């Protein structure tokens, strides 16, 4: 309701087509529902009309309130890198489908295996080929320095690489051992998606800021008698 009070400030109003569509929808609600249902939801035709009007105005106001936001985002501000990575997990699944955690000795043996893979990758071998031969699957991910998935230590190590094709040392974590290869310093698709996300955040911040200011400027009266009925 607060948003609709400021509609005139943005020259936002319902068109004749929208008013007719709302009228038709409210009438259909009245036809399709019994008096008992209407009573439960406090939804007589007049109330439904009012709610639909407010919802429509609110949707139109959202666009108006977000207008003027700076939509320019540089590649530098939104840059997303991409990598391939392997996980040598400390958890296995037995024949009954139960998860089992490796013993300390098994973890040490796995570390030796992972180090051998790391050496081969640093020697120039293809990650997918090396992984496939060992029954592993090379995963891909896009990221920046603030990413935390799939693992923050993996992200930090991959983000520290300076050249495409560089490979991390083995990365020991609580869940297993990672190895990553930097495949792109600027993944175009992921970077463009991040730009859209940044613009959306800016719009939301502007919307929320306006709404908060309007709340401060509006005296909200608490109807105690009404609250007692709720």
What are these regions (language model features)?
Residues 1-42:
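N-terminal targeting/tethering segments
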Residues 18-28, 142-149, 228:
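Short linear loop/turn motifs
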Residues 1, 55, 120-124:
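Residues at alpha-helix boundaries and the short loops/turns that link adjacent helices
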Residues 127-137:
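Short, well-ordered alpha-helical segments enriched in acidic and aromatic residues
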Residues 20, 35-116, 132, 149-230:
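PPIase-associated folding chaperone regions across multiple families
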Residues 120-128, 164-166:
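Glycine-centered tight-turn and secondary-structure capping sites
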């Amino acid at each position: 309701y607060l948003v609709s009070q400021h509609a005139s400030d943005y020259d936002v109003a319902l068109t004749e087509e929208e008013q007719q569509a709302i009228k038709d929808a409210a009438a259909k609600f009245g036809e399709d529902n019994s008096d008992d249902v209407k009573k439960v939801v406090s939804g007589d035709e007049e109330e439904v009309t009012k709610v639909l009007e407010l919802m429509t105005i609110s949707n139109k106001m959202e666009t108006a309130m977000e207008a003027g936001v700076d939509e320019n985002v540089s590649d530098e501000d939104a840059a997303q890198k991409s990598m391939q990575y392997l996980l040598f997990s400390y958890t296995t699944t037995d024949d009954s489908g139960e998860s089992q955690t490796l013993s300390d000795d098994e973890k040490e043996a796995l570390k030796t295996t992972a180090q051998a893979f790391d050496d081969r990758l640093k020697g120039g071998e293809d990650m997918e080929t090396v992984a496939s031969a060992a029954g592993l699957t090379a995963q891909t991910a896009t990221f920046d320095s603030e990413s935390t998935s799939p693992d923050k230590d993996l992200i930090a190590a991959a983000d520290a690489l300076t050249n495409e094709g560089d490979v991390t040392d083995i990365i020991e974590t609580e869940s297993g051992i990672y190895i990553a290869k930097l495949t792109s310093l600027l993944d175009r698709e992921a970077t463009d998606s991040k730009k859209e996300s940044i613009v959306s955040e800016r719009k939301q911040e502007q919307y929320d800021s306006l709404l908060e200011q309007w709340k401060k400027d509006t005296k909200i009266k608490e109807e105690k008698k009404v609250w007692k009925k709720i």
